[in-house]
Amino acid sequence: ATSFMPLSHLLLALLVVFIWGTNFVVIKWGLAEFPAFLFAALRFLFSALPWIVILRRPAVPWNMLARAGLLLGVGQFGLVYWAMREDISPGLASLVVQAQVFFTIIMSMVVTGERARPLQIMALILATCGYGLVAWYSATDPTSAVTLFGFGVVMAAAFCWACTNMVMRKAGRVNMLAFTAWSSLFAIVPLLLISLFTEGADSVVYALTHASGWGWVAAVWQGVGNTVFGFGMWGWLLARHPAVTITPMALLVPVFGILASAVLLQEALPAWKIIATCLVLGGLSLNVYASRARGKR
């Protein structure tokens, strides 16, 4: 792995984070035609098929794949989609779910007993101030594009994402794309059952039979573009460059998410939202810097 990135690799990394950021808008389009948990089930159906036929199952226990699939499918995406139907805008969802970074750090410290470094504590304080601002406006401002319920649900999704990170870390060096495809199998049936019980069989059947071509494009894109291409290319880049060179690019995901939501969905950008975004991104950036400083020692 080399820290030098050719322009083509840099552009590829930018394309991946652009896809991940703008995908929050695509999710919103899909949710206009599918109930939330059904849409999540379709995402994981297209993430698993036909890739499990092409990609060999990673050499990890089945129960590890099942844990990752349930946490990622029901916990992360099921909850994010549920909140995004009515309770949080795509731009804010892309920002709030990044709390997974800090949940992962805290979990790692609990598991390993490692103490937080001063820069990490500062990063956590900055991000907490940003998320506190979002929580305050979600509770007090009816025009804030987020309810307190929506904020809480996406925070829970971020926690589930962090739990998935811990499972994947335990899996060790595996093909990330194969791991994602095979673990997706375990998300499909639970999400479909939740959809049938909470959204009703009638709405499920109606959505499947009446969705437009664009609705299906949004569903397929979740699996093919966002998951298979996104994770596949990200894994390819991580195999060729150090993580400290590649992972900072992910900071642009909420930036693209917020900008795409503003341009394509006319999501308002009041001052408090810009300040909250800067605080969270400041915290995330400081955390990346802390990781780099630690890596150089």
Residue ranges and their predicted role:
Residues 5-10, 32-37, 41, 58-63, ...:
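Juxtamembrane helix-entry segments on the extracytoplasmic side of multipass membrane proteins
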Residues 38-48, 81-121, 157, 243-262:
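Specific alpha-helical transmembrane segments that line the substrate/conduction pathway
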